[in-house]
């Protein structure tokens, strides 16, 4: 089977990393500050909460040109007698005649996507404000069998899911009146490898969600795949059969639990994307292949196609410049890598590592427990003991824990290069004060709540 990999291997190979960026741990979408917009969604109107049954919901995601809107049209014209409501960002994008919509018995709500940052205790979530209002309103009408939400091509699925589970100040939540049933992502079989390899920022294509949206196309594609229950591998008629298998197995490695369905023109049985009961938030959060690898769950069946993975663990910090050399020179066969890292120059802060195709980001993940004052540790003895389980040696829980997924990877060689990027025995002996003076070309980390000029190196 490896012989069949050759022709498509270059398309999946990310080539040299083209984008090395700093990214805040929670930065996934453009965010709005907590203002009057947040106060406006502090509670759901009582009349909206008066519903006899929960409204099941399917969310459609997919990059521009994947066939997501075609899937929506297929659902609307083959709804098998159900009374369906639809929420879309732009009516013009559906391109269905208004008379046909009326004949189909479909109610379409146009609600431009609007993000708002909400706080619940110490947890901060970015939610879809438009959905908080519209879904509750539709559910309160008690006349629909199903709701389909078509997200924009640059949307990530997780904020939608968080919108359903988030409890507002009065204790109400969308999940009280509607149930998130299925998260569907449509993938262009021909374009996926190419876009994954690119490091184009959405902003460079005029697609940014707003000021400060530094995501790349590759970041977005991976986010859409990793949080899906059902993935339509679309436009397979435009790709050689062997290459379709290769793309499917790559997606399977990124999200082992998703059901992958091959389609042409997004044609699929209604029951495969509606009423599946597949969505579970906790399961979805654990679905990404990199996280399953860290948890010891391997996906060996993809290895015959040259798709493999390995975990790198170490208990000494990276030298920033040697790590930078690895990132820009040695990751051409790596399609996805994720985890946390320890940089010698930023000894007290955990680094969050995320790479998708040709895009690499690194940002702060909070202080290591070993660098956290005892007063800020968990008060519960069992929780504190759990924290200490990660401690080893003089540097506590500081460590490298990274998962690499790629095609044609030489794991042994990559491990060797990563090991060479760690501090030497002599450098380790010099201690943290000496490490702080090492050259460090990585972008500075803007810590949570810090102002410009208060970055951490």
Language-model features, listed with the residues they occupy:
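Short amphipathic C-terminal alpha-helix that caps PH/PH-like domains
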Residues: 414-422
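Short, well-ordered alpha-helical microsegments
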Residues: 132, 156-157, 320, 411-414
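N-terminal chloroplast transit peptides
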Residues: 1-19, 24
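Nucleotide-state-sensitive switch-loop elements of NTP-binding domains
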Residues: 44-61, 66-219
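Non-catalytic alpha-helical coupling and interface elements of nucleotide-dependent molecular machines
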Residues: 77, 140, 165-169, 188, ...
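C-terminal accessory "lid"/substrate-recognition subdomains
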Residues: 31-48, 198-401, 411, 425-457
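N-terminal, immediately post-signal peptide pro-regions of secreted/luminal proteins
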Residues: 22-33
């Amino acid at each position: 089977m490896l012989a069949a990999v050759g022709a498509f291997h270059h398309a999946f190979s990310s080539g040299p990393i083209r984008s090395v960026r700093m990214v805040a741990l929670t930065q996934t979408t453009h965010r709005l500050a907590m203002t009057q917009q947040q106060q406006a969604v502090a509670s759901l109107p009582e009349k909206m909460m008066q519903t006899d049954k929960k409204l099941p919901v399917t969310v459609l995601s997919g990059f521009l040109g994947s066939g997501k809107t075609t899937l929506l049209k297929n659902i609307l014209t083959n709804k098998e007698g159900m009374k369906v409501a639809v929420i879309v960002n732009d009516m013009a994008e559906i391109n269905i005649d208004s008379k046909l919509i009326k004949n189909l018995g479909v109610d379409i709500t146009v609600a431009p996507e609007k993000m708002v940052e909400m706080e619940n205790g110490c947890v901060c979530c970015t939610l879809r404000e438009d959905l908080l209002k519209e879904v509750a309103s539709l559910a309160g009408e008690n006349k629909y069998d199903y709701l389909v939400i078509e997200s924009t091509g640059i949307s990530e699925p997780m904020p939608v899911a968080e919108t359903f589970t988030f409890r507002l100040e009065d204790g109400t939540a969308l999940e009280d009146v509607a149930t998130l049933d299925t998260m569907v992502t449509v993938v262009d079989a021909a374009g996926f490898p190419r876009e994954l390899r690119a490091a184009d920022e959405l902003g460079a294509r005029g697609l940014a969600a707003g000021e400060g949206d530094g995501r790349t196309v590759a970041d977005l594609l991976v986010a859409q795949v990793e949080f899906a229950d059902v993935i339509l591998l679309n436009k397979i008629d435009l790709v050689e059969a062997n290459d379709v298998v290769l793309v499917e197995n790559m997606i399977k490695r990124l999200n082992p639990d998703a059901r992958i369905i091959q389609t042409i023109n997004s044609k699929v049985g209604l029951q495969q994307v509606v009423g599946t009961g597949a969505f579970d938030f906790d399961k979805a959060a654990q679905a990404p292949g990199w996280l399953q690898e860290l948890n010891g769950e391997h996906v060996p069946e993809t290895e015959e196609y040259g798709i493999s993975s390995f975990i790198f663990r170490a208990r000494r910090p990276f030298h920033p410049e040697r790590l930078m050399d690895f990132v820009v020179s040695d990751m051409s066969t790596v399609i996805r890598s994720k985890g946390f890292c320890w940089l010698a120059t930023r000894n007290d802060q955990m680094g969050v590592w995320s790479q998708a195709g040709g895009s690499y980001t690194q940002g702060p993940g909070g202080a290591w427990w070993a660098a956290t004052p005892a007063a800020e540790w968990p008060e519960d003895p069992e929780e504190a003991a759990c924290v200490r389980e990660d401690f080893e040696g003089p540097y506590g829980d500081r460590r490298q824990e990274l998962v690499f997924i790629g095609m044609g990877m030489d794991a042994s060689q990559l491990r060797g290069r990563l090991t060479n990027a760690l501090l030497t025995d002599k450098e380790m002996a010099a201690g943290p004060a000496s490490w702080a003076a090492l050259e460090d070309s990585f972008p500075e980390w803007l810590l949570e709540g810090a102002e410009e000029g208060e970055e951490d190196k």
